[in-house]
């Protein structure tokens, strides 16, 4: 594989249940590069779950931490998976310009199926289906804004999504 194909980070964005962590890890393995997940780094460094941070500190504090860690990880090579709401930050959206950003697009039915109705995700408490629909609608334009490529994940396995990203990476060069 050409070194040109793996230089600079490949960034994965998408809503809850789009497969960011699974696809990101598989893609990094396929490319032989490091995989970093912003949410996992937040949990590791804080020693608390995302839900605990939301509950104890509030969403604005979590978003500030997410923005800070995204900015720290974005220059590193490999594959970087952002949290579903990272694109809410104008600073993060601006920082993504010039990077290869893949939006893993997921529909409501698949998102609910993958996330589950009994979820510990802080923004999905209560009516999971309704909250997911709201998130998908509110964030679609922001995902579209940052994406260099849109990958539909609804009817594809994680391995098939990785294949589509690999083909798109070659086409982008």
Question: PLM features: what roles do these ranges have?
Answer:
Residues 12:
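Hydrophobic anchor at the beta1->P-loop junction of P-loop NTPases
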Residues 20:
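Conserved lysine of the Walker
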Residues 23:
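Hydrophobic positions on the alpha1 helix immediately C-terminal to the Walker A/P-loop
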Residues 15:
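P-loop (Walker A) phosphate-binding loop of NTP-binding proteins
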Residues 84-87, 107-109, 156:
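Short glycine-rich anion-binding loops that position phosphate/pyrophosphate groups of nucleotides
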Residues 96-118:
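Conserved phosphate-donor/acceptor-positioning beta-strand/loop module used by diverse small-molecule
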Residues 37-86, 90-95, 120-121, 129, ...:
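ATP-dependent small-molecule kinase phosphotransfer cores
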Residues 1-5, 26, 30, 138-173:
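NTP-dependent small-molecule kinase module
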């Amino acid at each position: 594989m050409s070194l040109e194909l793996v230089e600079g980070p490949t960034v994965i964005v998408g809503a809850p249940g789009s497969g960011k962590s699974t696809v990101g890890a598989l893609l990094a393995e396929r490319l032989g590069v490091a995989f970093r997940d912003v949410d996992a780094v937040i949990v590791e460094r804080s020693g608390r779950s995302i839900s605990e941070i939301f509950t104890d500190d509030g969403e604005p504090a979590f978003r500030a931490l997410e923005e800070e860690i995204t900015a720290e990880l974005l220059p590193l090579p490999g594959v970087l998976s952002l949290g579903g709401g990272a694109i809410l930050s104008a600073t993060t959206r601006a920082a993504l310009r010039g990077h290869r950003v893949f939006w893993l697009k997921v529909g409501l039915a698949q998102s609910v199926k993958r996330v589950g109705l009994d979820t510990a995700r802080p923004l999905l408490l209560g009516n999971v289906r309704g909250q997911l629909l709201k998130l998908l609608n509110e964030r679609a334009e922001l995902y579209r804004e940052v994406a260099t490529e849109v990958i539909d994940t609804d009817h594809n396995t994680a391995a098939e999504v990785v294949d589509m990203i690999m083909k798109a990476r070659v086409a982008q060069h």
